[in-house]
Amino acid sequence: MKQAPQNATGTPAAAPLAHPYVGMWVTQDGHIRHELLPNGRYDEARGHRKSAYQGYYTITGHHIDYVDDTGFTAEGDFRRGVLYHAGMVLYREEPAP
């Protein structure tokens, strides 16, 4: 089972603050929403269920690995501005101005 990366103090390592993939990723119908937070955590909403899954993520190049708080792992890839994850296609949601 994968574990979240840790720093020297044994706490989860943070993702870079300025990483270009940080932000909200949403399926075309809006049902699945992945918020990649700058601290290396993610929050996934499904339909009306906010925070359905939460955990850590790491990004290496264009690949993302997820480890939720129960230990479940998943992965995905960013290609041409689109996140492909577990059979889903998610698009970046730009923040409102």
Q: What residue ranges belong to the model's regions?
A:
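Lipid interaction determinants
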Residues: 1-97
